[in-house]
Amino acid sequence: VNLTAAEKTQVTNLWGKVNVKELGGEALSRLLVVYPWTRRFFEHFGDLSTADAVLHNAKVLAHGEKVLTSFGEGLKHLDNLKGTFADLSELHCDKLHVDPENFRLLGNVLVIVLARHFGKEFTPDVQAAYEKVVAGVANALAHKYH
């Protein structure tokens, strides 16, 4: 990801305030509610039949935390996202057969969740930096597909 020093600082400063458990669960839940076709990758998580079921599904919330924990790890390696996410890219491509477009969708949802939680602190400049990061992470996760 091609970020300026100021953008890297904005991203890492905001990320230091993120409650990974709360926002991870919210981001993955929103993905599954807004884009219901993504639920097919999580059928083994139990009842995902309604928005309420998704929003209160313990496995969805736990996996959302896991996803954002990995995302946070990627923020420590912004200059090597492909290397950082190589194993996850392989897993999602070869074993789980996840449509790589879903990575982009989840990134978009994450930006919305961050904006909702941080309000005025999530300035247009911070949003622009996060848009670059989520695009870079989505690209890194889709790398094995190419």
Swiss-Prot record:
Pfam families: Globin. Residues 2-146 form the Globin domain. It comes from the Eukaryota. InterPro entries: Globin, Globin-like_sf, Globin/Proto, Hemoglobin_b, Hemoglobin_oxygen_transport. Red blood cells. GO terms for molecular function: haptoglobin binding; heme binding; hemoglobin alpha binding; metal ion binding; organic acid binding; oxygen binding; oxygen carrier activity; peroxidase activity. One of its GO terms (cellular component) is haptoglobin-hemoglobin complex. The modification S-nitrosocysteine is found at residue 93. Heme b binds at residues 63, 92. The modification N-acetylvaline is found at residue 1. GO terms for biological process: hydrogen peroxide catabolic process. The modification Phosphothreonine is found at residue 12. SUPFAM superfamilies: Globin-like. The modification N6-acetyllysine is found at residues 59, 82, 144. Keywords: Acetylation, Heme, Iron, Metal-binding, Oxygen transport, Phosphoprotein, S-nitrosylation, Transport. Involved in oxygen transport from the lung to the various peripheral tissues. Heterotetramer of two alpha chains and two beta chains. Belongs to the globin family. This is Hemoglobin subunit beta. The lineage of its organism: Eukaryota, Metazoa, Chordata, Craniata, Vertebrata.
